Design a protein with these regions (language model features):
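Nucleotide-sugar donor-binding/catalytic module of glycosyltransferases
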Residues: 1-122
């Protein structure tokens, strides 16, 4: 079994850095489970990797990965491209600029999936 409960795949494509930061802060606030934050860049015109890596460190996100697709492939294929880098037992896609509801959102998803033998969901 994976040691990481859930991977959040944060999809980005030419978003403002402030939008990406909003989402990253929302993930960093999570408690009650282990998570990986995986930023999946769909070949934005400018890479945000250095800034995202620095912010992840500042926020205390220890399990952080940034992957950049070599060409723009749209959201679904961007997520599919990121999946091999995911370490979590479960996956939660999140669009840049979106935030999780509260600090226990990921823990609630993990608990629900485990309690109900969920293998896939949206």
């Amino acid at each position: 079994m994976s040691q990481t409960d859930i991977t959040v795949i944060l999809t980005v494509y030419n978003q403002r850095p402030e939008s990406i930061e909003t989402s990253m802060r929302s993930v960093a606030a999570q408690t009650g489970c282990t998570y990986q934050l995986l930023v999946a860049d769909d070949h934005s015109s400018e890479s945000f990797e250095d800034e995202a890596t620095a912010l992840a460190s500042e926020l205390g996100i220890s399990n952080f990965t940034y992957v950049r697709h070599p060409e723009n492939v749209q959201t679904v294929r961007n997520i599919l491209h990121a999946l091999p880098y995911a370490e979590g037992q479960f996956i939660k896609p999140l669009g840049a600029g979106d935030a999780l509801y509260d600090e226990s959102t990921l823990a609630a998803i993990v608990a629900f999936c485990r309690d109900n033998d969920v293998h896939a969901g949206f």
